[in-house]
Amino acid sequence: MALQTREARTLAEKVWDDHVVVSGRNEAPDLIYIDLHLVHEVTSPQAFDGLRLAGRPVRRPDLTIATEDHNVPTVDIDKPIADPVSRTQVETLRRNCAEFGIRLHPMGDVEQGIVHVVGPQLGLTQPGMTIVCGDSHTSTHGAFGALAMGIGTSEVEHVLATQTLPLRPFKTMAVNVDGRLPAGVSAKDIILALIAKIGTGGGQGHVIEYRGSAIESLSMEGRMTICNMSIEAGARAGMVAPDETTYEYLRNRPHAPTGAQWDAALGYWQQLRTDPGAVFDTEVHLDAAELSPFVTWGTNPGQGVPLCATVPDPELIGDDGERQAAEKALAYMDLEPGKAMRDIAVDAVFVGSCTNGRIEDLRVVAEVLRGRKVAPGVRMLIVPGSMRVRAQAEKEGLGEVFTVAGAEWRQAGCSMCLGMNPDQLAPGERCAATSNRNFEGRQGKGGRTHLVSPAVAAATAVRGTLSAPADLN
């Protein structure tokens, strides 16, 4: 069925319809054109091998951009990568990009960084686009009104070869967040509260559109944080309709349109809103005024509670599967039911990742750390999401604030978000992290992760236990 027959359409449906090359028939998928393909060193080697074996070129190298992020160290970046597997992946990406004519921002380059930070800051990410990457958190780019999703390695090869992807239409979900956020509550708290409410499978098969006055009041950085973690709710993608905040963020970015092209683009972008009367498959509501700083206690992003709460008791969970999962999580996290979240001591604090490694996040952290010290026995890593973010932070004097406080101010990369580089937890170490996943071993074998906002991360580093800035007064 041709999707263009719909009258009142959601934002996701509009972007989808604009990119259908061939409509699927008899339950076949639609063939969707891809506007931007982001590539990194981990999920691309086999895709390039497939092209090489088939004798195929990259169809649109001009719509493909690569950066090194997952495996790169965040110190001594002028030296060879020590780990042989990481070194091989980075060197392979460099060879593949050179062979196939793909733009690459390597380690040390002024535009190097996490792929989901680099795309937006360069103005490559724009409203109405379809964007893919061999990475779960590609949904970040949906903050601009783009339909952005993570894909597997075989799909990476398909996009490299054809600039298209066969996809079946997704269901749609509206997450309405209305009201005024209380002081000290951020976008990270919104998304953690949502995932706790609907669960890690609540958005399965859906594209989530985040709507409402609280979402509209967020900066682009805040919107990216929320869309970034859509996948942790099981969703295929997350989106926010573009508005003046979006346009101002994009204006004068290196790859943003200019002059008459800007005017034409703006005319299209302004149509990218869900039509009155459009029907979502699912709707969820959150009252922003009732939210507070949020933190996870378990081993998936849905196992979270307000910071002011206590570790939940699995015996009070009715569902057998959820109860068993909670028991297993508490055993791994070495936590007892009833313990106040604010009494949980940490060994490390990590600020960074594609969730919270942007300049706005670093400003929040600096505001908390200024005039204070990281608690004895706590190691704090602050890792900018890109070299451009690092340069801006240095220009604003934030780097000095971090180092004077006793934090480690690093170079750009994925860092301690995942155990694919030297920045890892030791077994049994507990970390408050601004990243997006708290799975067992995510930050290193045996490491224990609590997901938090940048403000909570900074306060936790100072106090030594899970804390909000208000706890420091």
Swiss-Prot record:
<keyword id="KW-0100">Branched-chain amino acid biosynthesis</keyword>
<protein>
    <recommendedName>
        <fullName>3-isopropylmalate dehydratase large subunit</fullName>
        <ecNumber>4.2.1.33</ecNumber>
    </recommendedName>
</protein>
<dbReference type="InterPro" id="IPR050067">
    <property type="entry name" value="IPM_dehydratase_rel_enz"/>
</dbReference>
<keyword id="KW-0028">Amino-acid biosynthesis</keyword>
<dbReference type="InterPro" id="IPR001030">
    <property type="entry name" value="Acoase/IPM_deHydtase_lsu_aba"/>
</dbReference>
<keyword id="KW-0411">Iron-sulfur</keyword>
<keyword id="KW-0004">4Fe-4S</keyword>
<dbReference type="GO" id="GO:0051539">
    <property type="term" value="F:4 iron, 4 sulfur cluster binding"/>
</dbReference>
<feature type="binding site">
    <location>
        <position position="414"/>
    </location>
    <ligand>
        <name>[4Fe-4S] cluster</name>
    </ligand>
</feature>
<comment type="subunit">
    <text>Heterodimer of LeuC and LeuD.</text>
</comment>
<dbReference type="InterPro" id="IPR033941">
    <property type="entry name" value="IPMI_cat"/>
</dbReference>
<keyword id="KW-0479">Metal-binding</keyword>
<comment type="pathway">
    <text>Amino-acid biosynthesis; L-leucine biosynthesis; L-leucine from 3-methyl-2-oxobutanoate: step 2/4.</text>
</comment>
<comment type="similarity">
    <text>Belongs to the aconitase/IPM isomerase family. LeuC type 1 subfamily.</text>
</comment>
<keyword id="KW-0408">Iron</keyword>
<dbReference type="GO" id="GO:0009098">
    <property type="term" value="P:L-leucine biosynthetic process"/>
</dbReference>
<feature type="binding site">
    <location>
        <position position="417"/>
    </location>
    <ligand>
        <name>[4Fe-4S] cluster</name>
    </ligand>
</feature>
<comment type="function">
    <text>Catalyzes the isomerization between 2-isopropylmalate and 3-isopropylmalate, via the formation of 2-isopropylmaleate.</text>
</comment>
<dbReference type="GO" id="GO:0046872">
    <property type="term" value="F:metal ion binding"/>
</dbReference>
<dbReference type="InterPro" id="IPR036008">
    <property type="entry name" value="Aconitase_4Fe-4S_dom"/>
</dbReference>
<dbReference type="Pfam" id="PF00330">
    <property type="entry name" value="Aconitase"/>
</dbReference>
<dbReference type="InterPro" id="IPR015931">
    <property type="entry name" value="Acnase/IPM_dHydase_lsu_aba_1/3"/>
</dbReference>
<dbReference type="InterPro" id="IPR004430">
    <property type="entry name" value="3-IsopropMal_deHydase_lsu"/>
</dbReference>
<dbReference type="GO" id="GO:0003861">
    <property type="term" value="F:3-isopropylmalate dehydratase activity"/>
</dbReference>
<keyword id="KW-0456">Lyase</keyword>
<dbReference type="InterPro" id="IPR018136">
    <property type="entry name" value="Aconitase_4Fe-4S_BS"/>
</dbReference>
<feature type="binding site">
    <location>
        <position position="354"/>
    </location>
    <ligand>
        <name>[4Fe-4S] cluster</name>
    </ligand>
</feature>
<keyword id="KW-0432">Leucine biosynthesis</keyword>
